[in-house]
């Protein structure tokens, strides 16, 4: 009986693997997805910057249809179609919709969009951090370096645990 259940599991496993191998998949290059994110963020930043000048009725041309290629900027009409990658099927991404709408992480408003305008405010907050900071850690690193290392640790871009920072 155990041999029959083991062979039935093997048969189901083989069937599922082979059925996924025949399916066609469509993909969009990561470069184009990242370009879309950058252009959407750029347009949002411009909209927030010019929201107080509502009397202007001229609309800026959209950069969404263009991409940066080796030959320069060119129209991206034919890249809107999905590409057939054959029977290469990634089992992790199986079942996800083909047209995922990629949105920017955060829609920044006000002075966070253009930090160059609030340079005086940044200097004051840095000065407050220096006055409040730990005495034993401030001797080892300057304040900016310590904050940068902690942020890198929190993002997981380094190969050491957070407590070593």
From Swiss-Prot:
Residues 1-21 form the signal peptide. GO terms for molecular function: melanin-concentrating hormone activity; type 1 melanin-concentrating hormone receptor binding. It comes from the Eukaryota. Residues 69-82 have a biased composition (Basic and acidic residues). Keywords: Amidation, Cleavage on pair of basic residues, Disulfide bond, Hormone, Neuropeptide, Secreted, Signal. The keyword Disulfide bond applies. It holds the Pfam family Pro-MCH. Induction: Inhibited by neurogenic stress or osmotic stress. MCH inhibits ACTH secretion at the end of the light on period which corresponds to the peak of the circadian rhythm in ACTH. Inhibits also stress induced ACTH release during the light off period of the cycle. Involved as a neurotransmitter or neuromodulator in a broad array of neuronal functions. Stimulates sexual behavior when injected into the ventromedial nucleus, this effect is antagonized by NEI. In the medial preoptic area, stimulates anxiety and sexual behavior. Antagonizes inhibitory effect of melanotropin alpha on exploration behavior. This is Pro-MCH. It comes from Rattus norvegicus (Rat).
């Amino acid at each position: 009986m155990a041999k029959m259940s083991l062979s039935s599991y093997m048969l189901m496993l083989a069937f599922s693997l082979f059925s996924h191998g025949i399916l066609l998949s469509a993909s969009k290059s990561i470069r184009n997805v990242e370009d879309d994110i950058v252009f959407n963020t750029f347009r949002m930043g411009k909209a927030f910057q010019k929201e107080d000048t509502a009397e202007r009725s001229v609309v800026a041309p959209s950069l969404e249809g263009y991409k940066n290629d080796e030959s320069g900027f060119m129209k991206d009409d034919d890249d809107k179609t999905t590409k057939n990658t054959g029977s290469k099927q990634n089992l992790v991404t199986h079942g996800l919709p083909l047209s995922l709408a990629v949105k920017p992480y955060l829609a920044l408003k006000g002075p966070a969009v253009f930090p160059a305008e609030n340079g005086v405010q940044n200097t004051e907050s840095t000065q407050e951090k220096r006055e409040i900071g730990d005495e034993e850690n401030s001797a080892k690193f300057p304040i900016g370096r310590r904050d940068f290392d902690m942020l890198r640790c929190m993002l997981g871009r380094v190969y050491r645990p957070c407590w070593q920072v």
